[in-house]
UniProtKB/Swiss-Prot annotation:
Keyword field: Glycoprotein, Glycosyltransferase, Golgi apparatus, Membrane, Signal-anchor, Transferase, Transmembrane, Transmembrane helix
Compartments (UniProt record): Golgi apparatus membrane
Organism lineage string: Eukaryota, Metazoa, Chordata, Craniata, Vertebrata
Alphabetical list of Pfam families matching this protein: Glyco_transf_29
Native species: Pan troglodytes (Chimpanzee)
Catalytic activity: a neolactoside nLc4Cer(d18:1(4E)) + CMP-N-acetyl-beta-neuraminate = a neolactoside IV(3)-alpha-NeuAc-nLc4Cer(d18:1(4E)) + CMP + H(+); a beta-D-galactosyl-(1->4)-N-acetyl-beta-D-glucosaminyl derivative + CMP-N-acetyl-beta-neuraminate = an N-acetyl-alpha-neuraminyl-(2->3)-beta-D-galactosyl-(1->4)-N-acetyl-beta-D-glucosaminyl derivative + CMP + H(+); a neolactoside nLc6Cer(d18:1(4E)) + CMP-N-acetyl-beta-neuraminate = a neolactoside VI(3)-alpha-NeuNAc-nLc6Cer(d18:1(4E)) + CMP + H(+)
Protein name according to UniProt: Type 2 lactosamine alpha-2,3-sialyltransferase
ATP-binding in keyword set: no
Single GO molecular function: sialyltransferase activity
Residue ranges, Cytoplasmic side: 1-4
Amino acid sequence: MRGYLVAIFLSAVFLYYVLHCILWGTNVYWVAPVEMKRRNKIQPCLSKPAFASLLRFHQFHPFLCAADFRKIASLYGSDKFDLPYGMRTSAEYFRLALSKLQSCDLFDEFDNIPCKKCVVVGNGGVLKNKTLGEKIDSYDVIIRMNNGPVLGHEEEVGRRTTFRLFYPESVFSDPIHNDPNTTMILTAFKPHDLRWLLELLMGDKINTNGFWKKPALNLIYKPYQIRILDPFIIRTAAYELLHFPKVFPKNQKPKHPTTGIIAITLAFYICHEVHLAGFKYNFSDLKSPLHYYGNATMSLMNKNAYHNVTAEQLFLKDIIEKNLVINLTQD
């Protein structure tokens, strides 16, 4: 009898092992966060993109993965900078936040379209009454930012969103804005941003200290939708594209790239062709609308001490005139 029970036990163990291997091998079950790593790659193209000369590295995976983020940081130099452009003193914050996410994939595992044509949709008032929605929705990849709404503005900006960049102070908190097909990308500028994400994912009380305005107190997105942007992307925008100094004079506030420029930089790394919409500002009329939504005016942009809007406009003018990108809202 005892031998019979042992045989049954061993058979059960073997059956469990076989089923375990089959199910995990076919990705039926969720991948454990601590083992989270890249499962797909950017499809290469035979020809170089028009903007290739702007980048020092190509085919860079833009999202951090729990399995190798420290190795990637060392390889690309992010371990030599503090936030917002590195993780030298914040690696543990990154580790904790990444451990609660379910994926660091770039595209859906069944998406094998190479040479992607992308549009980066800014929030500029120039989009008002432009009726670009249908055209925007025709792109392979649509990148949006912050709390620029789609709902109620479909004719102007379209319906689809592939990626949306955000930070704690700019993310939607009303579930009406959640599109389950959108990947949300946290751009971390300070340790508080990572702590905020961790607290939300764990269901803890949110510590609102250290933010320039009150961050969202609830998360309308599922963990599978969230990614953390590699600081290398933001660093590239600041130092390689906008040529910001690494050290600002003591009497000046450090300048950082806007989310729009960061989104364009992201597009350079994952797309073969990049088009822009909503990146033109009317500085000649400070009463003109700042965004295609809401009532904010251009006077608000003039008061922003944390961004160098002049440098960004010169950069945009340069890449448009050189045909490195196509501007859908030129006029």
